[in-house]
């Protein structure tokens, strides 16, 4: 088995989804490689164009459903953070994508395998190839798997922001800051759970649980914010 065939098999295993060999090979083919060949070779720019659109739709839909309380402007910011070049490069590095690229000699000799723009474009081309081979739902699932760490990071950021967000909301409406209280503590010392309540003018507006007091308060703030911003 030649190197290209081995590379394609490896990449398929990493993606965990069937893609036609020819289509997958096209997805990792840079324009510089195609231009150096005597025979006509398809490069990945059209697949990148398609993958970019599918990626944006999948992330937009995910954020829309995940954060029903956020306005359009905030959703746009989160999407931009997720589909930026840095985010795509992290995914490329996780797949060791540079190893599989088909590059022209000049591009290869000048560091093309590590070039951020090339890696990011190739991730989008792979998404385009998967979409053509399968369907939107399967491609979306692959995207969610690939972006799992980035989505989790945003989740953690959002939870951390809710205490600040509800503080601003409550002080603007009521003048006084919200108050937090731990109302339940259970479990052994090495595995405790906590329940917190957030109160506004002595009225409980949110309750949340967590493995630490801070997490419980953050989750209570999240619940309260969703309730008050309806």
Curated annotation (Swiss-Prot):
Enzyme class: hydrolase
BP GO terms, sorted: mRNA processing; regulation of gene expression; rRNA processing; tRNA processing
Domain DRBM: 161-230
Amino acids binding Mg(2+): 48, 121, 124
GO CC annotations, alphabetized: cytoplasm
SUPFAM superfamilies xrefs: dsRNA-binding domain-like, RNase III domain-like
Catalyzed chemical reaction(s): Endonucleolytic cleavage to 5'-phosphomonoester
EC number of this enzyme: 3.1.26.3
Family: Belongs to the ribonuclease III family.
PANTHER family reported for this sequence: RIBONUCLEASE 3 (PTHR11207:SF0), RIBONUCLEASE III (PTHR11207)
Protein name: Ribonuclease 3
Lineage: Bacteria, Bacillati, Bacillota, Clostridia, Natranaerobiales
